[in-house]
Design a protein with these regions (language model features):
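Loop/helix-junction capping segments adjacent to catalytic residues or to phosphate/diphosphate-binding pockets
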Residues: 40, 105, 136
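Residues at secondary-structure transition points
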Residues: 84-88, 106, 133
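Acetyl-CoA-dependent GNAT
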Residues: 12-13, 17, 21-25, 32-88, ...
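Conserved GNAT acetyl-CoA-binding A-motif
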Residues: 119-131
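Conserved active-site alpha-helix within GNAT-family acetyltransferase domains
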Residues: 109, 121, 133-151
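Terminal substrate-recognition subdomain of acyl/acetyltransferases
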Residues: 1-12, 130, 143-165
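Conserved acetyl-CoA-binding loop-helix of GNAT-fold acetyltransferases
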Residues: 98, 104-117, 144
Length: 165
């Protein structure tokens, strides 16, 4: 992954977006934003992710963005210190979403900018994520934000939950 430098100080296109730590009150809005993008509601998934993020409050890296006082987007990330045979601290971007009314208003960019700042302060050297190979809009967004293909291969193994041997 390339290390994209932060913009020079001054007026940024993300300045109208307030980015803050995610909290329990954000759950329903996060679920609703994700449901529009994914086509399904995943309240339990986000409840578990939010509970984990709040419990790790000292290392909170999950954020929401507000535009005009309303939650307009979110990013959920996790920290890893040596898992999967990687010696340096890394982070995983687990989920990101922007309300459809706020797309094109640099909300996602503001979220990633703040996430990068937070992770850099924690001395995290790499941010990783996974994207469906046919989600071209998200792939284009991540490319624009400096993500490149990783030198790792994600593997799947189909399991049969009805088979007990």
């Amino acid at each position: 992954m390339s290390t994209k430098p932060l913009e020079e100080p001054g007026i940024l296109e993300t300045d109208s977006t307030l980015v803050r730590l995610m909290n329990e009150r954000d759950l329903e809005t996060v679920v609703a934003i994700d449901a529009v993008a994914s086509g399904r509601r995943r309240p339990r998934y986000f409840q578990l992710m939010l509970e984990r993020a709040v419990k790790q409050a000292a290392l909170q890296v999950s954020l929401v963005a507000e535009v005009e006082g309303r939650v307009a987007g979110f990013v959920i990330a996790s920290l890893y210190y040596g898992e999967y045979g990687v010696s340096e601290p890394t982070a995983s971007l687990d989920a990101i979403g922007v309300h459809k009314a706020n797309r094109g208003r640099h909300v996602g960019k503001a979220l990633l900018r703040q996430l990068r700042l937070n992770l850099s302060a924690l001395r995290v050297t790499t941010l990783r994520t996974e994207v469906s190979w046919d989600d071209f809009d998200l792939l284009a967004f991540f490319k624009k934000e400096g993500f490149t293909p990783a030198h790792r291969l994600c593997l799947d193994c189909a399991l049969d939950p009805t088979r007990f041997e």
